[in-house]
Amino acid sequence: KQTLFSLLMCVLAIAGCDTQKQAIVGYELALTRAKQTLDSLYLNYSVSGTCLLRENYPSNIGEYTATYLASEEQKNMPNLYSYLWPYSGTFSAVNALFATTGDKEYKSVLDNKVLVGLEEYFDTRRTPEAYASYINSAPQSDRFYDDNVWLGIDFTDTYMLTKEPKYLQKAQLIWNFIE
């Protein structure tokens, strides 16, 4: 009985070690894929001279129409840049990479690329201030609660990671819009 128990413990220990190794390999693979996806996104969707992204790839600005828009008028207007909803996904993605790795490179990408582009959507013409669905240099666009809620969560997450008050202040501005 004691030999069988010892053998069982050895098998469980070995199986547990293998599971841990697989988890580490799975984590590293997922992290590599996340980094490659972010790099590919900026390689293929970036708009030269800006921190903004295109709506689609390959970019066919004259032919592309966003079928998810509220009106036919908006749908038929070509846009040089993505709408807020797809753009804001970069904020969540870079936040997740920063939180996972602790690599300050992602903080730099966040501050010098993602948030710079995001500010192009920040609408100060209406109160309370909030993020609009399209960039401010275009005609005034809608502001959606759900888009802003997700951004508020991302700003809060960034604040929790960095303890820098500027992120919390932005989350509070968004909350004023949601309220």
Residue ranges and their predicted role:
Residues V11, Y159-T162, I178:
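A generic secondary-structure signal for well-formed alpha-helical elements
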